[in-house]
Amino acid sequence: MRKSVIGNHLIDSTVNSDNRYIEYLSQVIGLVLREPSQRANEIAIATANEARRSQEIWRELSTMNASQAKELADRIDFTHLTQIADYLNTSQRGAIFTGLHAGDYLLALLKLRSRLTTPRNIYVLRRKAASNLEARVFSHFDDTDIPIKVVRHGDNKTLSVVRALRKGHFVTALFDLPRSFGKAAELQFLDHAMQMVTGPSELAVMGRADLVPFTSNFYNGQSSACFEQPIRATTVEHTAQKLCDVGSNYIYRNPEQWQHWFHVPEMLGAR
């Protein structure tokens, strides 16, 4: 059994059933956001439902043809999409698309992909093993001029990705992950000192690339997404902290949308 301490409270991160899982999420949310138990439970139920809905989007995309997938992604109301797409299509710099596991992040990336016109490679950083479902979903992002190249954690291809960024190619890597997913640093996240991965920021510094953060929501049957101001990387930790600030501000406004509450105990130091 793994436990994390927040103040004088213990969080049990071993989950054996749906009810136990909701109780666990409720504890995490209540202690981190200092919410009363009823509100924390409401958020826990909502975020668990969001995670299930997100998995269903993956399954749905895997059964669609290209035009159906594009139609689904085009339903997203995407703020600043035209401006960011114009910037990406004309800039010679590499870029890293990064965000949280929240809302319809996958469809947001697909809609962005449909607006890219300059031939580049897109490198997708993934930890999960390859699967037929993944291949079918990523086929909607792939074409001759802008091919998708999946890079697995542990493939020892960091330098290849860095070289690609320096040549102006793109990378997709989300940043709301604990240290078990890669190199991490202690950063301020949700007003707590947490161990957060620094991979996207490290790649941006080494690859002399811009970070392009985005957020996504799904409320009342409508998906929306928004690009944040692109970040010009400086030092790894300073850049990673900027991403954490973007993520914290989003989660404070939309706690029900974030799907990675279950990682918080590890981020706080649970082993």
Please provide the spans of the model-predicted regions:
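A structural signal for well-ordered alpha-helical scaffolds and beta->alpha junctions
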Residues: 18-22, 131-134, 197, 240, ...
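Membrane-anchoring hydrophobic helices of lipid-metabolizing enzymes
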Residues: 1-104, 137-140
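Non-catalytic C-terminal accessory region of glycerolipid acyltransferases
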Residues: 94, 114, 155-271
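Catalytic core of membrane glycerolipid acyltransferases/transacylases, capturing the structured
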Residues: 94-153, 181-183
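Short amphipathic alpha-helical segments and helix-helix/interface helices
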Residues: 84-88, 109-114, 137-143, 161-162, ...
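Short acidic-hydrophobic, aromatic-tinged amphipathic segments that line or gate anion-handling sites
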Residues: 76-81, 147-155, 232
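Short, contiguous strand/loop micro-motifs
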Residues: 12-13, 71, 125, 148, ...
